[in-house]
Amino acid sequence: MCIRDSLLGPDLQLFRLLDSAVLEPVSAIVVLGGSAPLRALEAARLYKDGWAPEIILNQALRRETFYAFSSLGIDLVEQHEYNREALLRSGVPEKAIMVIEEEVENTYAELRAVLQALPEETTLIIVTSNYHTRRAAAIWNHLTGGQVKGLIRWSRSDTSFDPTTWWKNRRSKRFLVNEYMGLIIYWLGFPLGIAFL
């Protein structure tokens, strides 16, 4: 057995990077930013399977490049717009899609904005990528004190990270390191660390 397998195991279960809840009907489905449109496609499947009557999207923080293009008269399509279009083309009606107006730049800000925008009794399915599930769950539990149900689900369309062969792919190694660094910062409770989650 190699050191990699003894520390992490081929399926990453020792350090529990991956997390996924058993589904049950909820108030809404939240699509976390990133990996457009793959997370939105999973949300559309969940919606059509009857798990929730509404899908929530966040708007990413507009950075300097957005405004530079805009000043040149170049219109950029933002990620939430791609996701919205993917939902519509997947058969989700427009009235079932909610876009939160607040611009956000990380998972913590996304989930905080969702929590602030919805009624207290809301329950959610939170869709992300498989490598991001543990951190998303930790942040949600931190924000809600574990009092608001948020079921974590990864997108089956997003195959960018394979937990059984992650060490063979540079991108997967980067995902793994980034997620563990985020979790370590979170677990250590660094005051500034929360901004990076």
List where the protein language model places each region.
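Conserved small/polar residues in nucleotide/adenosyl-binding loops
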Residues: 1-5
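A structural signal for short, hydrophobic/glycine-enriched beta-strand patches
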Residues: 11-168
